[in-house]
Every structure is written in C-alpha cells, then in structure tokens.
Amino acid sequence: MDYIAKLTAIAKSHGGIIETRISEQHGISKAMLYNLCKEDKIHRIVKGQYILPDDMQDELLSISKRSDRIIFSHETALFLHGISDRTPFEHTVTAPSGCIPSAAIKSECKVYYIKPELFELGKTTLRTPSGNNVPAYDLERTICDVIRSRNKLG
C-alpha cells in the first residue's frame, strides 16, 4: 500500500494540507502519519495538520481549518481583498463571544470577539494568495471593523 500516493491525493484535494481526520478516513492511521513524519516524508504544521515536503504551506488555509468558529477580519481581510499589499505580520480573526479559540490560533493570530448574533454578518469566502478559499468578512464589514477598532490596530 503506497501511503505517500494516498497522502499526495489528499493534499491535492485539500489545498495542500493533510488533516489527521481525513487521512484516517482513507485508512492512514495517526501512527502511520507519525512514522512518515519521523522519516521526513511529511512535515507537521500543527497538531492534526501535515504537508508534503515539497509543498508550500498556505498559512491562512491552515489557520481556517483549525476552527469553523473564526473568520478572517481587519488587516488580514484587507489583505485578502487586495486593499493592502503588505502581508500582515500577525493575522487577525474574529470569533463569537463565548468561543475560545485554540492555543495554536491565539499564538498565531490576534483574536477579536463579537456578539454571536453579529458573527455571521458580512461573511464571505475569499481566495488566499495560494488560491485556496477561506472565510473572511466582506469589504463593507471589514472597513467598519477597522474603523471600530482603529485604536487597537498595530
């Protein structure tokens, strides 16, 4: 059984990222992923996510796959809309109040919180520079968020 061929197909159909749960659905166990990682046949991004050695990591896609309760906002949304030509040093996401993003998300992103009833307002899908779709706020919502948070922006 050629695990690398299976993982290559998984990566190709999921934006270059191999998730543990998806590989298990294809008959590749966590232990096998661990062994392949030790052999340098795949690289671990964060818990539950891997990439092939020759692939470039799409950081935005990786972050968005870690939680369905975050949406790219503020500076990151401006970048995705093409308004800012500078890649943000720290990505910004918005989560509903009461939702606690993982430590991995908090360490890589600035997290803003919003009332749950306003969380989905203005949600759309945008393409990353690598060509993958991620959730982000539309331009109108992004501009409102930037103005509302202008004293907190870095």
Indicate where each model-derived feature is located.
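Short amphipathic alpha-helical interaction segments
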Residues: Q25-K38
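N-terminal amphipathic/basic helix or basic patch
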Residues: D2-K6, I28-A31
